[in-house]
Curated annotation (Swiss-Prot):
The active site is at 270, 344. GO terms for molecular function: aminopeptidase activity; manganese ion binding; metalloaminopeptidase activity. Binds 2 manganese ions per subunit. Presumably involved in the processing and regular turnover of intracellular proteins. Catalyzes the removal of unsubstituted N-terminal amino acids from various peptides. NCBIfam families: PRK00913.3-1 (NF002079), PRK00913.3-3 (NF002081). This is Cytosol aminopeptidase. One of its GO terms (cellular component) is cytoplasm. It comes from Helicobacter pylori (strain ATCC 700392 / 26695). Its EC number is 3.4.11.1, 3.4.11.10. GO terms for biological process: proteolysis.
Length: 496
């Protein structure tokens, strides 16, 4: 992980092997920009990166005056620098966008530091020739690129220290999620997932309860159990329950995650191409583990429960079948018409378990539907639920954190598509359209009336795992949901 060192000095006086200078909105007029003739000769117009080898300056373009683009550009700069021979880089403090906001300086520093730190991530566990980055340190000179309004209340140094703490915690939490999601299924089993959760619990002094199939049987979590039937003798299920309890808690929050450590589709077998990357179907459960790490280290004033349903969905003589009827923990019967709609079965029982805790808010995370990716693209998560205020708060705070989110509306016409003639509900829609919403409506069937306005469903199927670099995310897992939900919890507590 890149070490960031804060120094009370000017940018010019800071010492490092290389300088990083951002070109914001194609403005080359600042004194930190050197050798403008060279930039003109090579027609560098402030987009992407450009290395001035003579002066050892890396220029990184920020296309617009936008804090999210600053974060992305910082990440791109570090990705470039890690391929070079510099051990250290220095950078000043930049303020992009929303200069009139009281927290503008803090948010810019968070973005800068997080972008710098995330730029070094690469999942290379199984590479025989690992190329370790030479870059080890970023020196941040506590000098403003330009004055920022309304920052008198908080000194630059104080804001920088707070931002650095956030960036370190968030980077660690995101890397926990990314490493877990990227772990191949031969290793990343339900038991392995529980072991990762136990490490997080031990480090943060959290309560943890890891339950096996016998517990699931006792609690009548038959929908969850059905999904695991083909894997039971080899990779049994785990219900993981993490608990963070601060001395003062303004709210009780339950975070629920789908932890499908591998999903071949079951007897409704996926085509070969669709099976590849299904190690990422544990993205929701992994995000919950990362969130418990982040929220505990940030010391939020909320009692937080993290509930992960970890299992495989495989084929075999004991596999559950289309035409099966399952009785869920909530007592509702489910007609199975497609075994590849399995994540919602696991979540149904886990949401029932979460409601037994009587939380003030329930948020579930799942790589639930390909339909969500078709509808919103691979970079955006969907928000569903009944409470407009809660949905808006998650969307607004999530967007400010740098994640992309959009609300999808429930409606009575789509609800009819999951009706069953022989059970209380069907696990798959009778139509190919609106699949992300019908999956959310299926989960809604297992939310009790008193929790309808307390529940949010977040479908992270798109951004949880993308096979290319984008924004501050490396190839593979992104840790989708962690930044957004952390910001959501912080905003929720401000209103408590």
């Amino acid at each position: 992980m890149l070490k960031i060192k804060l120094e009370k000095t000017t940018f010019e006086n800071a010492k490092a092997e290389c300088s990083l200078v951002f070109i914001i909105n194609k403005d080359f007029s600042h004194a930190w920009v050197k050798n403008k003739e060279l930039l003109e000769t090579f027609k560098y117009e402030g987009e992407g990166v450009f290395l001035d080898q003579e002066n050892k300056i890396l220029y990184a373009g920020v296309k617009e005056d936008d804090v999210h683009l600053l974060r992305e550009s910082a990440c791109l700069a570090v990705r470039t620098l890690k391929k070079l021979a510099f051990k250290s880089v220095k950078v000043g403090v930049y303020t992009c966008g929303a200069h009139s906001k009281d927290n503008a300086l803090l948010e810019n520093l968070k973005a800068l530091f997080l972008g710098l730190k995330l730029g070094l991530y690469e999942y290379d566990t199984f590479k025989s020739n690992k190329k370790e980055s030479v870059l080890k340190e970023a020196i941040v000179a506590l000098e403003l690129h330009k004055p920022c309004e309304k920052t008198c209340a908080n000194s630059l140094e104080k804001s920088a220290k707070e931002a650095l703490k956030y960036a370190e915690i968030m980077t660690e939490s995101l890397n926990i999620v990314k490493d877990l999601v990227n772990t191949p299924p031969m290793i990343g089993t339900p038991v392995y997932m529980a072991e990762v959760a136990q490490k997080v619990a031990k480090e943060n002094h959290l309560e943890i309860h890891v339950h096996d199939e016998k517990f699931l049987e006792e609690k009548k979590m038959n929908a969850f159990l059905a999904v695991n039937k083909a894997s039971l003798s080899v990779n049994p299920p785990r219900l993981i329950h993490l608990v963070y309890k601060p001395k003062k808690a303004k709210k009780k929050i339950a975070l629920v995650g789908k932890g499908l450590t591998y999903d071949c589709g079951g007897l409704s077998l996926k085509p070969a191409d669709y099976m590849v990357t299904m190690k990422a179907d544990k993205g929701g459960g992994s995000a919950v583990i990362g969130l418990l790490n982040a929220l505990a280290k940030l010391g939020v004033e909320a009692e937080v429960h993290g509930i992960i349903g970890a299992t495989e969905n495989m084929i075999g003589p004991a596999a559950y079948k289309p035409d099966d009827i399952l009785i869920s923990k909530e007592g509702k019967s489910i007609e199975v018409r497609n075994t590849d709609a399995e994540g919602r079965l696991v979540l149904a029982d886990c949401l029932s378990y979460a409601q037994d805790l009587n939380p003030d808010v329930i948020v579930d995370f799942a790589t639930l539907t390909g339909a969500c990716v078709v509808g919103l693209g691979e970079f955006t998560s969907a928000i569903m639920g009944h409470n407009e205020e809660l949905k808006n708060l998650f969307e607004t705070s999530g967007l400010e954190s740098g994640e992309l989110l959009a609300k999808l509306p429930f409606n009575r016409h789509l609800k009819k598509l999951i009706e069953s003639k022989i059970a209380d509900v069907c696990n798959i829609s009778s139509s190919r359209y609106g699949g992300a919403i019908t999956a959310g409506l299926f989960l809604n069937e297992f939310i009790r009336d008193e929790f309808k306005d307390k529940w949010l469903h977040i479908d992270i199927a798109g951004p949880a795992y993308v096979e290319k670099e984008w924004d501050v995310n490396s190839f593979g897992a992104s840790g989708a949901g962690v930044r957004a939900c952390t910001a959501f919890v912080e905003e929720l507590l401000k209103k408590a």
